[in-house]
Design a protein with these regions (language model features):
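Short, low-complexity disordered leader/linker segments with a strong preference
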Residues: 1-34, 93-94, 115-120, 356-357
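Flexible loop/hinge segments that line or gate small-molecule binding clefts
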Residues: 110-147, 163-176, 280-287, 293
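Hinge/cleft segment of the Venus flytrap/periplasmic-binding protein
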Residues: 169-184, 300-301, 305-360
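Short, solvent-exposed amphipathic alpha-helices that sit
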Residues: 48-65, 148-152, 183-204, 222-226, ...
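Short beta-strand elements in bilobed, periplasmic/extracellular small-molecule ligand-binding domains
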Residues: 60-78, 197-220
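Extracytoplasmic "Venus flytrap"
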Residues: 34-61, 71-86, 103-107, 179-186, ...
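Hydrophobic alpha-helical segments within soluble ligand-binding/sensing domains
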Residues: 85, 140-171, 187, 220-227, ...
């Protein structure tokens, strides 16, 4: 009788062991934080660089053991719409990811889907471009808008002054943006307009908002076409444009390219080109003495992706919240959190003298 009891106990233990192993495996699996990153579109060097930084952060988090899993998807450039982003987000919500990091194409239209993710317990962060503040938990901002505008106008003003423009010689400027719904470009344009009213930059003028601010959207072909049109309008004289400023990482290289390929080029001694771009995208133009693109403005894009993942992981694990005072962002050190926003750092202005220092 006693031996039967012992046998029964051993049988129960034997049956429990596989169950315990399965349960432990499930618990281990559930402890892995799934972080999903959604750019405005895929296949462009700016967002590719941010992805590289994000993957670096994931590798760093998984150094001792696997604690984070990285998912990455986005619409192609020629389909960079809110609906395409929403379709991807819906899939991630169904997969029950822990963190979504998104650069919205339309900050208002995407809000409903982001709120749905939040209701499902997903931490929502924006990077590069913001959404409505009530539709995300944290905005990982690359640089404050005023800093971007300052860097762009400083770069343009420096080149123009070398060509004889200044307080006594007005220069007409034009900007190439993206879509009118893009929150970043609208914020930067607003700051540029404000700075143009100050004594330091009052000699630089956007004469006509309708004709001198271009909105090609995210399509590369349209961007190239409109940049070509702008290049054809540049030159000396009050009826011409003296400075072209690219407000996207697609527009600025397009301006350099369109000048280079123009059959009839404006006088390089009368014009200036600058704008936002990754250094590698405009390095050839900046180093070319026959091209008027002489300065670029950006931030460390890889660090932006890295910072976004660090913040997302710590929000998912409860190490920080939207109301925390700061975040310890790995190799980037401590970054302050103010009004549900963390800022990477100041704008980076580069030219021929230092562009080789940057490889992205």
């Amino acid at each position: 009788m006693k031996s039967r009891k012992i046998l029964a106990i051993l049988l129960i233990i034997a049956l429990m062991i596989p169950f315990t192993m399965i349960l432990g495996a499930c618990q281990a699996k559930s402890s892995v934080i799934k972080i999903a990153m959604l750019p405005k579109f895929k296949g462009e060097n700016y967002f590719d660089a941010a992805k590289n930084g994000a993957e670096e952060a994931i590798a760093e988090l998984n150094k001792e053991k696997k604690v984070a899993e990285f998912l990455y998807d986005g619409p192609p450039q020629d389909q960079a719409t809110n609906q395409k982003q929403v379709d991807i987000l819906e899939g991630w919500i169904a997969q029950k990811v822990n963190v979504i990091i998104v650069s919205p194409n339309d900050p208002t239209a995407i809000a409903e889907t982001l709120k749905k993710a939040q209701k499902n317990g997903i931490k929502v962060l924006t990077y590069d471009a913001d959404a409505q503040t009530d539709a995300r938990d944290l905005f990982v901002n690359q640089v404050v808008s005023a800093g971007v505008a300052q860097g762009l106008l400083e770069g343009a003003a420096k080149i123009l002054k070398e060509k004889g423009y200044g307080p006594d010689a007005t220069a007409n400027i034009a900007c190439v943006s993206s879509a009118k719904t893009d929150a970043n470009q609208q914020a930067w344009l607003s700051e540029i307009r404000n700075l143009l009213k100050t004594p330091e930059y009052s000699w630089m003028v956007i004469k006509d908002e309708n004709s001198d601010v271009y909105y090609p959207g995210p399509d590369e072909t349209t961007t190239q076409t409109q940049c070509g049109t702008l290049i054809s309008r540049m030159g000396a004289g009050d009826d011409k444009i003296q400075a072209a400023i690219g407000l996207t990482s697609m527009a600025t290289p397009a301006l350099g390219s369109q000048f280079q390929s123009a059959s009839v080029k404006p006088d390089i001694n009368e014009i200036a080109i600058t704008g936002l771009a990754t250094p590698n995208a405009i390095k050839a133009y900046i180093k070319d003495d026959t091209n008027p693109l002489k300065t670029g403005v950006l931030w460390n894009v890889m660090d932006l992706g890295y910072l976004a993942v660090q913040c997302g992981y710590q929000m998912a694990t409860g190490s920080i919240t939207s109301s925390s005072a700061s975040v310890n962002a790995g190799r980037l050190g401590e970054r302050k959190i103010v009004d549900k926003m963390v800022v990477l750092g100041p704008a980076l202005v580069f030219d021929k003298s230092d562009i080789d220092k940057y490889n992205y």
